[in-house]
């Protein structure tokens, strides 16, 4: 079952069009960028003449001048590698036991055109339709998708990039494979041919992939081990629908838009929807490090990670730091490899400053850095950001995000691109940061993952302190919490009042519930008061895995399995891809993940502080103020904005008519939250943000809410959804293939 015969003609037409639009293509943009970095001259200065004629022969930047030959050789090596670079894209597909309108696939791909605006490719057989949207970085033809084996038996659509694709290419060539392109997509395809499902353990990168094996009538979906790239699926009447974003699946009229009560129960507690749940009944996330195999109208989900024992831990903190030094250097060097403008998201904190330190050592040109700043002493990190930027001489751009920015328009756009509501208000600054980045760069390095690997969050410190607090009689802890309630309300970012109230209440909970409460919003009693369909079972099932661990590690594993992919990485992927920006997180290189998992806890967190191995590594490298500053995160003054610029949006959206019509929440409770917040009797900004984004998202996607007048218990299939995806498997348990 080969590709549709029309696809070849379509590609031929596309190639003809490419000759007409080349002057505005990504290739031309890339050439201009590379020429500027090589010769320090704008392409427009050549006035259409050969570059050598536009530069003085005496100029050191001339091809015949001092250093020019070396620069041309370097440029030639770059050109020779063009096509090896990965590309951003999105994928979609569906099965069909009966013939269907092929425009279905086009509609699904159109919904994610922002992920890959340059090329659309489709594959159709009697059983399956696969498609991809691609943002071409360099290779105009060689990397176009779908990509099939020479015999046409296996077809692949792929989103992401494989950083070790050159190593794998060499290994596969030695095994007899011959390549037709320099694309990493073809390397993934050949790896699957060679090793089958085991191939996914060998991939070092970020990806979501779909492969169709025609001879076996088998579809395989795969997602990278940390969940950097998203992949969703839906099974209905024996057919499967999948895509990089939920909106791909919603283009199919058979797919219900019914609200998932299990997803909403988790969302109200966690601020995000943990996999495999989504906020739409019947649509699921493929869990990180998992495969889905669909055959004969049935699907099976399982982990492709291989269990192994932890490596021998370093004997000392200095030894651990030396090992991390080598791993970080290798990962960042790999991820700097791009023939398009590249920058670094700089927060002025330890993680992003570390990336900049290494990148500056490897980059031959001035690095670009991008930052968001805020008004207000507790929210503004500008002083740290600018100090780090000056130290490394970056070409720096920053945006002060205040009430004058078009916040309401951004919130509406976020509701479209986010696919699911996310009560993490950090989506707003990431939206504006991505927007600013796109004007200057196509790729950005970012520090996601370091906190989850090395114990960098305030919640990890709170977990440690709570273990001590539990030795204090409960009546005394309750008394301390009652006293904390009398503290005056403060709008400071993670101020003393907020931390005291949150910690003392969490100290009255079990360790598992305390961990999520410190980072979430509604406690279980608060949720029961608010939500007509409150049910503790979905969250309890998610938390069960945390009970099997001990100490810090169980909390880190939970954060890596759920919080990182379903909140942090999901937020970054949707906001950046909405602007066609690729964000790379070097800390999530599998080698660093395995290294972190093998470290003893006291190399991560102890009385001396957090992320100790990383701080020790960067000692005497970064400014002391950066090394010693407390963790704050990219947060916004949402409490203040809800009393000011966003108050009309808040009150127009969460009004009595709207709340009663949806039938999800009790209006008196919502009204009380609104009134207490405006009267400064409590800071309910985070809680209200979660309800606001949920309501806007439901309106935008016409999501069907259950009728409050006919309440029913949570469907059992939502409680026990995708059990094979919920088994507790540490994400570090990857093994080299022997």
Feature locations, PLM:
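N-terminal amphipathic/hydrophobic targeting modules at extreme N-termini
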Residues: 1-4, 22-23, 35, 40-41, ...
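Adenosyl-5′-phosphate
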Residues: 85-91, 198, 251, 260, ...
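Cysteine-centered catalytic environments shared across enzyme families
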Residues: 86-418, 430, 434, 619-620, ...
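Intrinsic-disorder-associated, low-complexity terminal segments enriched in Asp/Asn/His/Tyr and depleted
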Residues: 4-6, 14, 24, 53, ...
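Active-site adenylate/phosphate-handling loop in enzymes that bind or generate adenylated species
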Residues: 225, 431-491, 563, 568, ...
């Amino acid at each position: 079952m080969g590709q549709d015969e029309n696809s070849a003609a379509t590609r031929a037409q596309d190639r003809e069009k490419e000759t007409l639009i080349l002057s505005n293509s990504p290739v031309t943009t890339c050439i201009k960028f590379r020429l500027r970095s090589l010769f320090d001259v704008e392409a427009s200065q050549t006035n259409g003449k050969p570059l050598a004629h536009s530069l003085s022969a005496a100029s050191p930047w001339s091809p015949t001048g001092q250093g020019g030959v070396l620069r041309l050789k370097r440029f030639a090596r770059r050109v020779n590698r063009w096509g090896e670079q990965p590309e951003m894209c999105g994928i979609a597909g569906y099965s069909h036991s009966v013939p269907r309108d092929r425009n279905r696939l086009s509609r699904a791909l159109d919904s994610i055109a922002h992920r890959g605006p340059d090329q659309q490719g489709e594959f159709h057989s009697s059983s399956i339709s696969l498609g991809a949207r691609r943002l071409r970085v360099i290779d105009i033809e060689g990397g176009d998708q779908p990509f099939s084996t020479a015999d046409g038996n296996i077809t692949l659509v792929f989103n992401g990039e494989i950083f070790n694709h050159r190593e794998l290419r060499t290994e596969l060539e030695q095994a007899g494979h011959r390549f037709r392109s320099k694309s990493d997509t073809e390397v993934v395809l050949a790896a699957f041919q060679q090793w089958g499902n085991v191939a996914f353990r060998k991939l070092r990168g970020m990806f979501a992939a779909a492969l169709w094996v025609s001879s076996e009538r088998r579809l395989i979906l795969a997602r990278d081990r940390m969940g950097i790239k998203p992949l969703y699926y839906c099974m209905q009447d024996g057919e499967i629908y999948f895509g990089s974003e939920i909106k791909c699946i919603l283009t199919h009229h058979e797919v219900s838009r019914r609200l998932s009560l299990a997803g909403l129960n988790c969302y109200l507690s966690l601020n995000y929807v943990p996999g495999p749940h989504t906020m739409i009944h019947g649509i699921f996330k493929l869990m990180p490090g998992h495969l889905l195999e669909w055959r004969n109208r049935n699907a099976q989900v399982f982990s492709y990670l291989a269990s192994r024992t932890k490596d021998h831990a370093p004997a000392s903190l200095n030894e651990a730091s030396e090992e991390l030094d080598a791993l970080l250097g290798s990962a960042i060097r790999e991820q700097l490899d791009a023939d398009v403008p590249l920058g670094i998201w700089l927060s002025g904190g330890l993680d992003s400053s570390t990336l900049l330190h290494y990148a500056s050592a490897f980059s031959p040109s001035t690095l670009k850095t991008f930052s968001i700043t805020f008004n207000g002493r507790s929210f503004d990190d500008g002083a740290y950001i600018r100090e780090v930027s000056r130290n490394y001489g970056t070409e720096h751009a920053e945006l002060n995000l205040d009430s004058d920015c078009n916040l309401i328009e951004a919130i509406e756009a976020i509701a479209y691109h986010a696919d699911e509501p996310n009560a993490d208000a950090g989506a707003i600054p990431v939206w504006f940061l991505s927007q600013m980045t796109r004007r200057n760069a196509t790729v950005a390095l970012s520090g996601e993952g370091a906190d989850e690997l090395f114990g960098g969050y305030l919640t990890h410190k709170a977990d440690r302190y709570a273990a001590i607090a539990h030795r204090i009689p409960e009546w005394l802890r309750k008394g301390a919490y009652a006293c904390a309630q009398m503290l005056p309300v403060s709008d400071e970012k993670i101020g003393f009042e907020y931390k005291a109230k949150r910690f003392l209440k969490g100290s009255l909970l079990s360790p598992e519930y305390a961990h999520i409460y410190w980072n979430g919003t509604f406690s279980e009693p608060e949720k029961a008061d608010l939500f007509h369909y409150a049910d503790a079972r979905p969250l309890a099932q998610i938390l069960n895995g945390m009970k099997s661990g001990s100490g810090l590690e169980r909390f880190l594993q939970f954060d890596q399995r759920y919080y990182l992919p379903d909140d942090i990485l999901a937020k970054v992927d949707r906001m950046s891809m909405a602007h066609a920006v690729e964000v790379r997180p070097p800390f999530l290189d599998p080698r660093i993940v395995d290294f972190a998992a093998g470290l003893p806890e006291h190399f991560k967190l102890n009385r001396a502080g957090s992320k100790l191995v990383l701080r020790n590594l960067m000692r005497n490298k970064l400014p002391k103020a950066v090394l010693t500053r407390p963790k704050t995160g990219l947060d916004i003054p949402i409490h203040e904005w809800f009393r000011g610029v966003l108050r009309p949006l808040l009150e127009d959206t969460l009004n009595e008519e709207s709340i009663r019509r949806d039938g999800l929440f009790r209006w008196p409770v919502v009204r009380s939250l609104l009134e207490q917040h405006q009267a400064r009797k409590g800071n309910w900004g985070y809680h209200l943000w979660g309800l606001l984004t949920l309501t806007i998202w439901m309106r935008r996607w016409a999501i069907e809410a259950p009728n409050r007048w006919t309440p029913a218990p949570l469907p059992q299939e939502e409680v026990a959804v995708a059990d094979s995806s919920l088994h507790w498997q540490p994400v570090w348990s990857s093994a080299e293939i022997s």
